[in-house]
Amino acid sequence: MNVSAQVKTTDSTFINNSRPIVFVVNRTDISESDKDWINNFLIPELEALGDRGIILGRATASPEGPTPNNVRLARSRKASMDALLGRYGINTKRIRYDVVPEDYPLLLSLMQMEHDKYLPTVKTIIRKHDGKGDQLKAELKRLEGGKIWNHLLKKYFPQLRAVRIMPIDERLADTIRLPA
């Protein structure tokens, strides 16, 4: 990857160059194909970057469940990745995550990249509620009789049940240190 600017975990560079390790709803298990990708791609790329190589990641949960459950899932998914990467000999000091249980910023980025027709409406609702709370979810569910919520649920929420990771030179990583 040839990147010359800071990479944030919500920008298109990260989204396009990271691998989403996607989880089943309410689960934290990592698939065999993802383990193969880590072994055959991620680790060699990280080694090629030398001492400055880190893994940049974003651990998330989709917003359809209760917020406390989404917090638990995002943290547990991060812990699952840490444990797996540790088994491959990767020190957690070389892993930088944003942990975002209900990832509305990433949802908006994905919608923008897809030129989704509902983006302006969804963005307005998310901003109105400052990206938090049950009122935000309730309002999204009411829009157009649930049509927009169902669209988000089918098209984008599966992508939010993930830990997205990529190898990168640490000088190019721009992470927001959130409490784990």
Across the structure, where does each feature detected by a protein language model lie?
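Sec/Tat signal peptide C-region and signal peptidase I cleavage site
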Residues: 2-5
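Glycine-rich loops and low-complexity Gly/Arg-rich segments
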Residues: 46-49, 80-84, 120-124
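Short, surface-exposed beta-strand segments enriched in small/polar/acidic residues
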Residues: 47-75, 85, 96-105
